[in-house]
């Protein structure tokens, strides 16, 4: 019977698949065909091995925009590009895998953090169908950006189970981000490829150009996404330099240096300020041991920002971005590029409240706040347009309940992360927790003036970091309950140890 089934079912299917593959070698498949193939290609392994899906989602979203642009060599710009759905299909598979784990009672947890994440995800989904002022399809399109990757929290919280696995994912992501940094420098020094130029000619993406000059975007969807990636890459480099290991410092310094040129030339000044704040937060603030010192530092920072904002005697900014990008792409000397990008470009930061872009954002924020008075539960997914702030976009679309939920998630993540840093005996794990808390802190700053949880890599790293912190905290609590204190009175250490060294794809750093 098995032989009959093999001869009359399996062999014909293999022949048919071979014929289809041969046909497609000579005929370029459509976007929809390509999308379906790659979704199935990545989805099936993800359902069987959810951890593999985690690696996919630290890679695919970074390079799919580059792959999409290659199609412009053979076809016109489509009204709807199905290739955008490839990584979303993998995320959907990961959600199904998590649901199956819960159904089988293997990874179920009554953790409050997980409940908050689930409630936030469900609220985002409900606002697609209920209380929305747009159609379901348009609402689903908004949910794709706002809500789908929220569940990546559970990748860090439940799918990965050991500290060593988490560090391997970090190593994989650092290599992926380094590749995008190098490609960004290629665009700066040698310009854009033919397919990228065709893509640029077909779009009206206003923020991609400044005075008609295109900013580098590497493999990402936009210069802002490139800046997010380089900001995270720099922080990973700083973490590796602080970590123990004979080879980590050099590799950390390499990727930190590689992140700087694309970050500067992309000219997203919010990322510059957020990175500086993140460096101080990681290297100084999270290493202070006394609470009153931390409160004093925070108070001084708030006072400084208030004085900075109220200062009115500063000169206005001249437009220098055009010269900056031309200097980068025409290969001018380093001093000229530094003068343009660092000295002149930062002149606008002296009095940002008088900048046109800031005034426009303030007008948008006022409109959302006024609208929220009449729609306290939000107007539904994809109804606010670009709000220039993730927090106000949440307020405008899912209302005050959604904003309170998100702020609760953010506060709990930062609080639990600091508890892990303070109470962990494992210095390597404490250092890793500092990195995760810093990533959350930096992206939270960026979300004040942008929506950095709508596109990779910001959304992927943010929710994954929260998930890892949740897992570390749960294990710390379980260990403390099992062994409340050692001989010295200190809480029990986490069961996850970091004695094996940081492992990267293809090589282990002891």
Label each residue range with its predicted role:
Residues 51-54, 107-122, 147, 155-192:
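Interfacial loop-to-transmembrane-helix boundary motif in multi-pass membrane proteins
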Residues 322-387, 391-394, 398-405:
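TM-adjacent membrane-interface loops and short helices in multi-pass inner/ER membrane proteins
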Residues 121-129, 167-199, 204-212, 218-288, ...:
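Alpha-helical transmembrane segments of multi-pass inner-membrane proteins
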Residues 84-94, 115-125, 135-158, 177:
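Aromatic-anchored transmembrane helix interface
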Residues 5-102, 126-130, 443, 464:
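N-terminal signal-anchor transmembrane segment
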Residues 18-20, 235, 276-279, 291-297, ...:
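Transmembrane alpha-helices of multi-pass inner-membrane enzymes
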Residues 1-17, 36-44, 168-175, 234-318, ...:
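Hydrophobic alpha-helical segments of polytopic membrane proteins
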Residues 254-258, 417-449, 461:
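Loop-to-helix entry and N-terminal half of a specific, functionally important transmembrane alpha helix
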């Amino acid at each position: 019977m098995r032989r009959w089934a093999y001869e009359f079912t399996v062999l014909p299917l293999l022949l048919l698949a071979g014929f289809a593959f041969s046909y497609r070698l000579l005929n370029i498949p459509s976007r929809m065909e390509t999308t379906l193939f790659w979704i199935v290609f990545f989805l099936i392994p993800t359902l069987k091995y959810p951890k593999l899906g985690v690696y996919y989602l630290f890679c695919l979203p970074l390079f799919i925009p580059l792959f999409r642009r290659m199609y412009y060599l053979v076809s016109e710009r489509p009204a709807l590009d199905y290739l955008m759905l490839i990584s979303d299909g993998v995320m959907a598979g990961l959600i199904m895998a998590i649901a199956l784990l819960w159904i089988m009672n293997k990874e179920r947890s009554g953790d409050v953090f997980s409940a908050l994440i689930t409630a936030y995800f469900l609220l985002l989904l409900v606002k697609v169908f209920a209380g929305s002022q747009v159609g379901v399809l348009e609402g689903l399109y908004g949910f794709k950006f706002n809500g789908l990757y929220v569940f990546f929290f559970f990748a860090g919280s439940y799918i990965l189970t050991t500290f060593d696995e988490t560090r391997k994912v970090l190593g994989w992501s650092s290599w992926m981000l380094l590749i995008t940094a190098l490609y960004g420098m290629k665009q700066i020094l040698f310009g854009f490829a033919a397919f990228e130029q065709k893509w640029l000619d077909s779009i009206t993406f206003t923020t991609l150009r400044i005075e008609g000059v295109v900013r580098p975007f590497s493999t990402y969807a936009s210069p802002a996404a490139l800046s997010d990636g380089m900001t995270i890459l720099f922080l990973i480099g700083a973490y590796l330099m602080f970590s123990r290991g004979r080879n980590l410092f050099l590799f950390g310094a390499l990727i930190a240096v590689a992140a700087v040129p694309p970050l500067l030339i992309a000219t997203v000044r919010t990322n510059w300020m957020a990175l500086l704040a993140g460096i101080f937060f990681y290297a100084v603030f999270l290493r202070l041991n006394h609470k009153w010192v931390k409160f004093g530092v925070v108070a001084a920072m708030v006072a400084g920002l208030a004085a900075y904002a109220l200062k009115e005697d500063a000169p206005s900014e001249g437009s220098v971005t055009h010269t900056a990008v031309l200097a980068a792409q025409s290969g001018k000397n380093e001093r000229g590029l530094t003068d343009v990008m660092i000295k002149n470009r930062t002149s606008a930061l002296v009095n940002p409240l008088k900048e046109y872009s800031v005034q426009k954002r303030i007008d948008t924020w006022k409109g959302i706040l006024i609208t929220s008075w009449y729609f306290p539960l939000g107007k539904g997914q994809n109804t606010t347009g670009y709000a220039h702030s993730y927090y106000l976009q949440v307020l405008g679309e899912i209302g005050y309940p959604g904003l309170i939920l998100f702020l609760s998630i953010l506060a709990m993540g930062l609080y639990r992360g600091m508890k892990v840093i303070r109470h962990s005996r494992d210095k390597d794990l404490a250092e890793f927790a500092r990195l995760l808390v810093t990533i959350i802190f930096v992206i939270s700053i960026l979300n004040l003036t942008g929506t950095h949880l709508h596109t990779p890599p910001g959304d992927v790293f943010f929710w994954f970091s929260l998930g890892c912190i949740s897992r570390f905290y749960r294990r710390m609590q379980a260990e403390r309950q099992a062994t409340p204190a050692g001989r010295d009175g200190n809480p029990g250490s986490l069961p996850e140890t970091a004695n094996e060294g940081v492992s990267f794809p293809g090589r282990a750093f002891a």
